[in-house]
Amino acid sequence: MNRKWDRIHTIIKTLGELRFKGRLRPETIRRADAAYDLPAVFKPEAFAGLNWETALPGDTWGGADRHFWFDTQVKLPADWRGEKVLLCLSTGATDLWNTDNPQVIVYRDGQMYGTMDLNHNRILLEERAAGGETVGLSFYAYSNSAGRTNFFDVSLCALDREIDQLYYDLKVLWDLADLMGDEENGRLELEEVLNRCVNLLDLRDVSGPAFAQSVKEAEAFLQTSHYSAERPLPRVVVHGIGHTHIDVAWKWPLRQTRQKAVRSFLTVIRLMEEYPEYRFMSSQPQLYQFVKEEAPWLYEKIRERVREGRWETEGAMWLEADCNLSSGESLIRHIL
């Protein structure tokens, strides 16, 4: 057992928890069954005919191929002025390979805003909150579970930017080192850097000024020792390009694939707004056709990103082939 390595990991996880310096839950959330309809914009009167009930903490919901609306309003605290605010959602799902886990489209003040699921359980709500503003949030939630097995725990979190930066800068190096062999030089070097960095943290009182100052010092050390442009690097350039793999007809009806395409591409657009350097590639023209029909405004956003050179359309086939079943002749006919 490597006690030093385990200690580093524990401290990184602790920083992950300390990133959230404030958390706010809605006073009430209402829930109603929803139709198989995907509005890009909805008006409050559209909710008038629904059979609403209060969604209490700990309530479960779900079912096979079903949709639900969740609706609430949240007033941000006045002292959150200038804070970076995230919308957080937990449904209780834990299986990363469960493609039927709850998937949600978020509407902010009536406008389609973002998407959430097991892998995307936080989205940016405010880069710098005004403080005291009221936000209307509605959630169009899809379930394909056998029964009422899902939860719906919504909260808004104020993010500490400096702790968040240090957390990810440490986590990237830890994840990288963890993939290496115990005796590899690269791992030993990273372990030394990580250990020296976490040793700078004053964890005696994480709410005090000494801890806040130590976070700045640890980040400065990490930038100088590892992330600095002056640090000699191997002559290797790696380009990270985003991609989403969507099976058009698999574990859910084809009509749900149309919504899945909208959810996935909306996530990409939001990430591009938050991270201008982000690049994305997707094939399967059929998916673009679905998005064009279901959410034309989103399709136009994609076209803008393509023109900017940030979104690459790829692929020789209209629909991605299942190469386990297809014959060589059918694949060639599809391409031609």
Q: Which functions belong to the PLM regions below?
A:
Residues M1-L336:
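Carbohydrate-active enzymes and regulators
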